[in-house]
Amino acid sequence: MKRPIKKHPQKIYVKVSADFDCLGGLHPRSIIWSDGRVFEIDDITDFYPGYTSDRSGDRYTIVIHGETRYLFFERTDEMIASKVGRWFVERVA
């Protein structure tokens, strides 16, 4: 019997409009796709620090148009001060 092939998620890097609060917390507000479509984030329902596979980023559970999705923030190399990180969503290939 054949075992099902496990599909690994593919990272899709996206532009995100976000705010920092007065305590340094990062809050995503909207996702902008490469084709220009903008999706406002209605709510952030959960946050998991260090959730990416290499523990270098965070996972936000967000709600867009009533649907729950995950949005990830991947921190970049600390040697480049002007680049804090980048955002991605996952798509199963």
What are these regions (language model features)?
Residues 1-93:
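Cysteine-centric segments in proteins
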